[in-house]
From Swiss-Prot:
Protein name stated in the entry: 4-hydroxy-tetrahydrodipicolinate synthase
Residues engaged in binding pyruvate: T45, I203
Main location per the UniProt record: cytoplasm
PANTHER family associated with the record: 4-HYDROXY-2-OXOGLUTARATE ALDOLASE, MITOCHONDRIAL, DIHYDRODIPICOLINATE SYNTHASE
Reaction catalysed by this enzyme: L-aspartate 4-semialdehyde + pyruvate = (2S,4S)-4-hydroxy-2,3,4,5-tetrahydrodipicolinate + H2O + H(+)
Family that this chain belongs to: Belongs to the DapA family.
The UniProt record lists the keyword Transcription: no
Lineage, broadest ranks: Bacteria, Pseudomonadati, Pseudomonadota, Betaproteobacteria, Burkholderiales
EC number: 4.3.3.7
Record note on quaternary structure: Homotetramer; dimer of dimers.
HAMAP family on file: DapA
GN (gene name): dapA
Length: 292
């Protein structure tokens, strides 16, 4: 089972929006050195909606090849087209990804039965472990615990990223899940609480800029070292809060560029962080110790 701090890694881009693949390789090496336990490539934070299919595949390929099995690579291959998700997932399997991340279909607003059939079709078509991804704040389609538990009966559906931020709902899911089905937080602000209640890790935005701290937090919380987890989380809280002052990944990319981790590029309709928030994010970085 994949567990711990799983970074939802950014896609480095130059000022003109071109992919920075050497920069991605450097980021991967840095994450491994800092203790990151796994990487989600081309997820929400990786700007999956604004990369082409060819770029999407290239990012997965580069991540898998460069990581070389040092840590697991989870390929973001989900979408609101079942057939396209199958094609991307097949590519991820072919190049050696360890698992796929399958987001609830967005915009077309499927029913619970539609969600079930969508995911079932993908995992039947491609023999690659799949992690479901429920993020109703972005998809406007909320997968119920009942549907998640129904899908959890399929052996290749190995877990869910719960980005609802609803701790009581997550606890109820964990109470009813099969023993080998993983639950990951997808919300940095509530991740510690969910892990202390039994979640297997955090698929994290904050880990992009504080990988060692997030690894330490996950290790402490998963292993029930409560006081240690609280102390680490308290240090990271300013980042949990201010990295979402505008929609992710805008504040995150600004913060990472500020300390030289990546260039400042992103793609429309995402635009750079408003100047009025620069000092606010910078202060959070200082408070959390990622900026001196």
């Amino acid at each position: 089972m994949i567990q711990g701090s799983i970074v939802a890694i950014v896609t480095p881009m130059h000022a003109d929006g071109a992919l920075d693949l050497p920069g991605l390789r450097k980021l991967i090496d840095w994450h491994i050195a800092e203790g990151t336990d796994g990487i989600v490539i081309v997820g929400t934070t990786g700007e999956s909606p604004t990369v082409s299919v060819d770029e999407h595949c290239e990012l997965i390929r580069v991540a898998v090849e460069h990581t070389a099995k040092r840590i697991p690579i989870i390929a973001g291959t989900g979408g609101n087209s079942t057939s396209e998700a199958i094609e991307l997932t097949q590519f991820a399997k072919d190049v050696g990804a360890d698992a796929s991340l399958q987001v609830v279909p967005y915009y077309n607003r499927p029913t619970q039965e539609g969600m079930y059939q969508h995911f079932k079709k993908i995992v039947e078509a491609v023999d690659l472990p799949a992690i479901l991804y429920n993020v109703p704040g972005r998809t406007v389609a909320d997968m119920s615990n009942e549907t998640i538990l129904r899908l959890a009966q399929i052996p290749s559906v190995i877990g869910v990223k719960d980005a609802t931020g609803n701790i009581s709902r997550g606890i109820d899911l964990m109470r009813l899940r099969p023993k080998d089905f993983a639950v990951y937080s997808g919300d940095d602000a509530t991740a510690m609480a969910l892990m202390l209640c039994g979640a297997n890790g955090n698929i994290s935005v904050t880990a992009n800029i504080a990988p060692r701290g997030m690894h330490q937090l996950c290790d402490a919380a998963i292993n029930q070292r409560v006081a240690e987890a609280i102390a680490i989380n308290n240090k990271l809280v300013p980042l949990h809060n201010k990295l979402f002052i505008e929609p992710n990944p805008v504040p995150l990319k600004w913060a990472m560029a500020e300390i030289g981790l990546i260039p400042s590029g992103m793609r429309l309709p995402i635009v750079p962080l408003a100047a009025e928030y620069h000092d606010i994010v910078r202060a959070a970085m200082r408070e959390s110790g990622v900026l001196q």
